[in-house]
């Protein structure tokens, strides 16, 4: 692709001050792979049914604790998400290195009954843990509970959502944990990122982009200090509480200022359709 002189100027500015994301203090992970989504990802009605089948209050509390709200890649929006009312039955396989034991299905009879109803689809699936009732090993299990940036693995719109609610995610999405996530989420949702880096991700059929980690690692992003991240934390909280174009433009202006873009450069970037 041949860039105009002003486009080349913007690209040089980004690359001159940017640090590749692979060198940031962040981690990028894939969402949960169950091997049988129809059994392990349930709606609110099925969740209520499973809980009603518990034989004691203790079982109900244990069961409720491992049925976690989950977002799919398609549910993620720019600064927002669609609540599809889905839940993950998180019968995880533990993390031996951290002393987290696997879920013992005998402690969860109501969940066992639900999973048993799927027969070989659960029992014989390839992605399983120590038992067919357990999900496959996931060394980053605790990362889902942390503040994180969520985004789909394939998308036309490249949306990012900063989650502090502890959503789990399916395997059609990725999560980023680490430092300065408020700023990073704002940058990834900005006009500048879309303008400069959309073409850094392979285009698939229908204009969809593939947002794999191997491509993210190469993206240069200006590092910031804690004070700057706190500024974007406030901006992010505001726009995620109630979205408006004015708030999105305000975030863009702060990003443009950080990169010291000229009015001419800003005008060109402002034409990007978000």
Indicate residue ranges for each PLM-predicted region:
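Polybasic, glycine- and aromatic-enriched phosphate-binding surface used to engage nucleic acids
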Residues: 1-227
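Non-catalytic DNA-recognition/assembly elements of restriction-modification systems
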Residues: 17, 21, 25, 110-114, ...
């Amino acid at each position: 692709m041949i860039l105009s002189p002003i486009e080349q100027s913007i690209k040089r500015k980004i690359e001159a001050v940017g640090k590749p994301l692979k060198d940031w203090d962040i981690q990028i992970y894939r969402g949960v792979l169950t091997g049988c989504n129809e059994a392990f990802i349930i709606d609110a009605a099925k969740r209520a049914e499973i809980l009603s089948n518990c034989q004691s209050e203790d079982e109900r509390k244990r069961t409720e604790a491992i049925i976690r709200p989950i977002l799919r890649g398609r549910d993620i929006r720019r600064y927002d998400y669609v609540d599809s009312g889905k839940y993950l039955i998180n019968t995880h396989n533990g993390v031996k290195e951290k002393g987290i034991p696997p879920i013992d299905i005998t402690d969860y009879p109501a969940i066992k009954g639900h999973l048993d109803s799927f027969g070989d689809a659960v029992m014989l699936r390839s992605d399983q843990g120590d038992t067919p009732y357990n999900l496959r090993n996931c060394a980053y299990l605790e990362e889902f509970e942390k503040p994180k940036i969520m985004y789909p693995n394939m998308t036309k719109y490249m949306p990012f959502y900063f989650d502090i609610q502890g959503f789990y995610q399916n395997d059609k999405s990725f999560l980023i944990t680490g430092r300065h996530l408020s700023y990073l989420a704002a940058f990834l949702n900005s006009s500048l990122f879309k303008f400069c880096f959309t073409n850094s991700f392979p285009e698939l059929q229908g204009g969809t982009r593939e947002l794999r980690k191997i491509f993210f690692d190469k993206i240069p992003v200006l590092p910031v200090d804690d004070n700057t991240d706190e500024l974007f934390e406030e901006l992010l909280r505001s726009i995620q509480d109630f979205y408006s174009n004015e708030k999105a433009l305000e975030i863009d202006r702060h990003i443009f200022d950080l990169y010291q873009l000229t009015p001419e450069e800003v005008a060109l970037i402002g034409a990007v359709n978000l």
